[in-house]
Amino acid sequence: MATPGMSWQQHYYGGSAAKFAPSPATAQLAGHSMDYSQEMHLKMSKKIAQLTKVIYALNTKNDEHESAIQALKDAHEEEIQQILAETREKILQYKSKVTEELDLRRKIQVLESSLEDHIKMKQQALTEFEAYKHRVEDMQLCAEAQHVQRIVTMSREVEEIRRKFEEKLRSFGQLQVQFEKDKRLALEDLQAAHRREIQELLKSQQDHSASVNKGQEKAEELHRMEVESLNKMLEELRLERKKLIEDYEGKLNKAQSFYERELDTLKRSQLFTAESLQASKEKEADLRKEFQGQEAILRKTIGKLKTELQMVQDEAGSLLDKCQKLQTALAIAENNVQVLQKQLDDAKEGEMALLSKHKEVESELAAARERLQQQASDLVLKASHIGMLQATQMTQEVTIKDLESEKSRVNERLSQLEEERAFLRSKTQSLDEEQKQQILELEKKVNEAKRTQQEYYERELKNLQSRLEEEVTQLNEAHSKTLEELAWKHHMAIEAVHSNAIRDKKKLQMDLEEQHNKDKLNLEEDKNQLQQELENLKEVLEDKLNTANQEIGHLQDMVRKSEQGLGSAEGLIASLQDSQERLQNELDLTKDSLKETKDALLNVEGELEQERQQHEETIAAMKEEEKLKVDKMAHDLEIKWTENLRQECSKLREELRLQHEEDKKSAMSQLLQLKDREKNAARDSWQKKVEDLLNQISLLKQNLEIQLSQSQTSLQQLQAQFTQERQRLTQELEELEEQHQQRHKSLKEAHVLAFQTMEEEKEKEQRALENHLQQKHSAELQSLKDAHRESMEGFRIEMEQELQTLRFELEDEGKAMLASLRSELNHQHAAAIDLLRHNHHQELAAAKMELERSIDISRRQSKEHICRITDLQEELRHREHHISELDKEVQHLHENISALTKELEFKGKEILRIRSESNQQIRLHEQDLNKRLEKELDVMTADHLREKNIMRADFNKTNELLKEINAALQVSLEEMEEKYLMRESKPEDIQMITELKAMLTERDQIIKKLIEDNKFYQLELVNRETNFNKVFNSSPTVGVINPLAKQKKKNDKSPTNRFVSVPNLSALESGGVGNGHPNRLDPIPNSPVHDIEFNSSKPLPQPVPPKGPKTFLSPAQSEASPVASPDPQRQEWFARYFTF
């Protein structure tokens, strides 16, 4: 009974042990997996080492770049400090000039004030002269007797002197008339010249405004033509793009139909499709990164353009403010001219008034002469007239001397003007030479700029051609690799795709060449326009030179005219100074125009750089479109291949199911369910991935369209801004030196910032790529390991579950049918074990195949990683090449900066030279003015001393007269005061005095009545107290509040030692009623009623109300009572008593 069962169990458990024992195949697989992991680890370590080397090299290069950038920053800061120092020096110099001008103006004001004082002094002298006449007439009466004999002898001499004096007066009058005529002629000439100059200036401003408007119209027409040509180009490019898209879609449809026919032959390409999907994902990620980088670059460029626009707008506002300031300065200058003209008119009026006064003086002199002829007998009058004539003779001699000195000064001024004329001629010649040199330098710079631009564009063409060739070679290599990998499956398909790609490339190359040719033509047109603008500027400068020469000739004519008239010397000096300032202004304008041409050249260079950047962006966009199209083709092919492979797999699985349905109904049901689940999950995952890719592609398309629209709008905005900038720059061309320096600084800062941002972006991209590759590699390895482990564990668990189910079923059946079916079960069990072993071996073989496939996938992935690393290295090389190009550009910028610094130094030297010359002229002018002022001051001091002495004498006389007048006035004042004090009183005052006296008497009577009433009440109280003491006399201390206290002696009268709450009224009235009785009892303490002077032994008489006024006071008080008023302190004591 036991033997067959045991044998069956041994056989069963032996089979199970054999089933679950570690087979040699699994051991081999485990060893293979270990070898695989070690090899992968070594490869990854090598790759990491290579990447660390690359990173170290990049870090060293970055350090070198940072050191170079620091050096550039230091140099830039030094240049900024130098420029700031120069600007400070310029500001100080301008401030010194302003202070000098202010000092000159102050001196002019002081001179004008001195002239006014001199006129006032003359008027005072005339008044004093008239007073002196009167005094002399008074003195003549006293000196008649003394000068009788002398006058007879001197009469003849006086007649001779009179004739001479009259002749001198006539000559002096003729000279004055001549001087006035000369002055009038000179003033008229100056006014006519000033009007002509103003008319010429107005004409020149009108011509300049007309030329500026014409230039603006031409620029606007050119800009419109450019905008129209660009719009046409855009429309042509859009049409070509649509055509290319349609052709490409037709080709894609043909290729898709061709590939759908050949999909039946492509069965084992699922792994390759997975790899291609991963590659496409990576490419998409790379494209996204590149696209984000391009977006960031575009945003930065837009921000820079916005900042530049704001800078230009600020500059335009500052220029407008400066224009307004200049207009206000012109208005102020015109007002000053009007004021000066008014002053001239006032001076003329003053001269006319002086002439009228002179005529009046002459008429007075004629009257005096008539008096002398009439009063020949009066010798005293003749003597006085002789003194007058001598004084006038002295004054006229002094005036003649002054006129001679003025003649000498005028001659000196003429010599100075001749010297200034020669200096101006030399200066104009030097300016002509400098302008010619500047024009030659400008021509040289323009030629050099043309050459540099031509070389730069040739280099860019060569670089673009090399880049295109490199890209073509890269694409050819990529296509060759794909052909080698897919040659055993679909040679014909790859050849067709390659041929289509080559055709597309050729078309794109043709399009790019056409675009490049168009860009070349546009650049040549811009060059021609610049040449025309330079020629126009040359013509304008030549016109300005001609006008300057004409003005110099006009000034020479004016100088010749000024030599003829003496009085117009100061006007000519002013006109020469104005002409000098105009010439300086014209020189500044020519310098500004030269700077404007330089700025225009810089703007054109910036525009060329922008067009180059746009060209590069279009090329990059076309490349991205090519990549996207290739990726789409690959993606579509992969999708179709995956669908065909799924169909084939499903067919094979159905055939296998049909073959093994009879044998694997119970054992393989669970395996099939698990496989179905895995299939569904894989299908869902693949479908999700495909949908995600399609969504990403649609989003990328939308983003591209949005970016195209944004770029178009930004282009339009930039064009509009460009037109605005041109208009503003044509209108505001005066003060651009500081703006140029600011732009230079801002460009340097922007360049430094862009360089830093580029370096930071490069570092970030490198780090991101390294992290991404490491993470991706680790994730893929872990996913492969986890998938392998999960598949093995699931397979083991499934087999255990199947064995357990079979064991339980067999045990149940064995218990029921042990005896009858044991032999049959043994045979069936053996057959089932054979079948299970066979299935197990097949499954192991399938697992081995899957492992081999996973190993192949990992190897292919490692190859792809190697390719990726090579691509990254190539990208690094490309970026290094780009960095070297940037270094070259930085060197070029440094060269430009050095050239600009040289130009600035040359201009600074010129400014210093002009400044030194102007300082010399100012010093000479100041010396001349000082000499003149010294001479004038000497004359003024002499006159002042004379007049001072005369005024002192007059002042002393007037002081004596004033003292006499003061004495007489004081005597009269004293008499008037005495009369005022001794005057009679008014009746109204007398009435008021009587009324007041009556009021005082009434008041005194009332006070007396009150005092008497008070005394009456006091006596009544005293009588009451005495009567009380008589009745109660047995107590030792009568009338005291404290009865236990000792009784004081009668003679002791010291009420001051006790405390009194209320003051005693009787005590205060010590000189009151009666003779004072010493035998009286002491009063009650603190009683204000009892008086010590009353007699205590005798009773007082009965109080009787007073019928009339009683005299209880002393005689002194009785005398003072009618006048004195009641005491306020006493009234207070009354109030305290009654309140107590």
Curated annotation (Swiss-Prot):
Coiled-coil region: 57-256, 296-800, 868-907
Bridged cysteine pairs (disulfide): none
Organism: Homo sapiens (Human)
UniProt name for this protein: Protein FAM184A
Family of this protein: Belongs to the FAM184 family.
GO cellular component, one term: intracellular membrane-bounded organelle
Subcellular localization: Cytoplasm, P-body; Cytoplasm, Cytoskeleton, Microtubule organizing center, Centrosome, Centriolar satellite
Pfam families: FAM184 (PF15665)
Keywords from the UniProt entry: Coiled coil, Cytoplasm, Cytoskeleton
Region Disordered: start-end pairs: 1063-1128
